Swiss-Prot record:
The gene is pcm. This is Protein-L-isoaspartate O-methyltransferase. Pfam families: PCMT. SUPFAM superfamilies: S-adenosyl-L-methionine-dependent methyltransferases (SSF53335). GO terms for cellular component: cytoplasm. Keywords: Cytoplasm, Methyltransferase, S-adenosyl-L-methionine, Transferase. HAMAP family: PIMT (MF_00090). The keyword S-adenosyl-L-methionine applies.
Length: 220
């Protein structure tokens, strides 16, 4: 029996869905070849885990399509010594990729049950070095700030100011910004005395709920 039955599916995902569409960071590609996405989706969806589409993970949340995960990860420009903050743990898949690239990963999840499942998924996949915290992601996580990179996996009307404040000098932040339905993916780079904004294209993410995001439904 093959030790890793989904290895070929991951290879094909990387080559045909990701590299073929312009993602060229070899460290990102290697991480996506390694991390078993099928361990981060519900059991009944494992057979479609490597298709290029988002999948439901419960409580109205999703695991993003592989290509969008790759785009966001590449634009973070993560170095091996970086400290990274993720807002919206979800399934834990994005955090697992970040852990392959960075020295430290903190991930904040609003929903306790989703956070618990993410921890279980990460343990099952053998991924370590990630601190999963339950809280309001729009407030970031000040105890570990500043961060070299921040990725936000849910959309808000504008980028929460606490996240910009917790980004270190030269830091990169990637987030979807705009209405609840569909948004623009943007990259912020914190320069000396200013913040540069770079548009990355249209996306559709679940809403980021919290004090500095969409209001209401703060508790599940």
């Amino acid at each position: 029996m093959e030790a890793d039955p989904c290895r070929r599916e991951r290879e094909e995902m990387v080559e045909f869905q990701i590299r073929a569409r312009g993602i060229g960071d070899e460290r990102v590609l290697a991480a996506m070849r390694k991390i078993p996405r099928h361990l981060f989706v519900p059991k009944n969806l494992e057979r479609v885990a490597y298709e290029d589409r988002p999948l439901p993970i419960g409580e109205g949340q999703t695991i993003s399509q592989p290509y969008i995960v790759a785009v966001m990860t590449e634009h973070l420009e993560i170095r091996s010594h970086d400290r990274v903050l993720e807002i919206g743990t979800g399934s834990g898949y994005q955090a697992a990729l970040l852990a392959e690239l960075a020295a430290k990963v903190v991930s904040v999840e609003r929903l306790p049950d989703i956070a618990d499942r993410a921890r279980e998924n990460l343990a099952r996949a053998g991924v370590t070095g990630i601190e999963v915290v339950v809280g309001d992601g729009t407030q970031g996580y000040p105890p570990e700030a500043p961060y070299d990179a921040i990725v936000v996996t849910a959309a808000s009307p504008e980028i929460p100011q606490p996240l910009i404040d917790q980004l270190g000098k030269g830091g990169r932040l990637v987030a979807p910004v705009g209405p609840r339905e569909c948004q623009d993916l943007v990259k912020l780079v914190k320069r000396e005395g200013r913040v540069e904004t770079i548009p990355l294209g249209g996306v559709c993410f679940v809403p980021l709920i919290g004090q500095f995001g969409w209001q209401g439904e703060v508790s599940p």
